[in-house]
Curated annotation (Swiss-Prot):
The keyword NAD applies. GO terms for molecular function: 4 iron, 4 sulfur cluster binding; iron ion binding; NADH dehydrogenase (ubiquinone) activity; quinone binding. It catalyses: a plastoquinone + NADH + (n+1) H(+)(in) = a plastoquinol + NAD(+) + n H(+)(out); a plastoquinone + NADPH + (n+1) H(+)(in) = a plastoquinol + NADP(+) + n H(+)(out). It is found in: Cellular thylakoid membrane. It comes from Trichormus variabilis (strain ATCC 29413 / PCC 7937). It holds the Pfam family Oxidored_q6. NDH-1 shuttles electrons from an unknown electron donor, via FMN and iron-sulfur (Fe-S) centers, to quinones in the respiratory and/or the photosynthetic chain. The immediate electron acceptor for the enzyme in this species is believed to be plastoquinone. Couples the redox reaction to proton translocation, and thus conserves the redox energy in a proton gradient. Cyanobacterial NDH-1 also plays a role in inorganic carbon-concentration. NDH-1 can be composed of about 15 different subunits; different subcomplexes with different compositions have been identified which probably have different functions. Its EC number is 7.1.1.-. Keywords: 4Fe-4S, Iron, Iron-sulfur, Membrane, Metal-binding, NAD, NADP, Plastoquinone, Quinone, Thylakoid, Translocase, Transport. Its cofactor is [4Fe-4S] cluster. This is NAD(P)H-quinone oxidoreductase subunit K.
Amino acid sequence: MVLNSDLTTQDKERIINPIERPTVTQDLSENVILTTVDDLYNWARLSSLWPLLFGTACCFIEFAALIGSRFDFDRFGLIPRSSPRQADLIITAGTITMKMAPQLVRLYEQMPEPKYVIAMGACTITGGMFSVDSPTAVRGVDKLIPVDVYLPGCPPRPEAIIDAIIKLRKKIANDSMQERSLIRQTHRFYSTTHNLKPVAEILTGKYMQSETRFNPPKELTEAIGLPVPPALLTSQTQKEEQKRG
């Protein structure tokens, strides 16, 4: 074995595969990121929330202020979507009525998993000022769909909406892919049966062909002052005789 005496110290430092363990320098630690699949997946989701805006009352006016340059909710990665199939967050802002409840549930079911809900305002959470006397207001949207973050207020300020989004981002950061397959939607909220009365469709597209348009009721024609057709008088007389029986 012949040693090369001309080998300098600089050439020794160029050894590609040294035997000893290399020391981790400060420059190397700043360029290496250690993470898990859950953390990477959650980070990508919380950084690009696409909300579906479901505004039915005055709370939506406060949420509209976030779109402006003063609050600028785009810095959180929020992009408003008009289609539920492209959204992963729905924000219910305003009173939910019995007639609007089936449409809200349908929009929620069309959203892909995982999906989240923010209940914004007192009317959405408990019914608000309509919870006592109104026969059509739903006393809490959590009776229809699961809610992740409750945002009280009448209406909440835009700063409160930002705080709710930050809390939702923290919740998304702690999600686990293994636990997500075991947790069902019914485990996330308290559900009670809501008696919804089925109502016939009003807008059928056949208004011009309706019977009442060609044969208006007798009371209506008398109130307007139109002459009552003989056929209408005969039909009204027959109906009265049938009722008397």
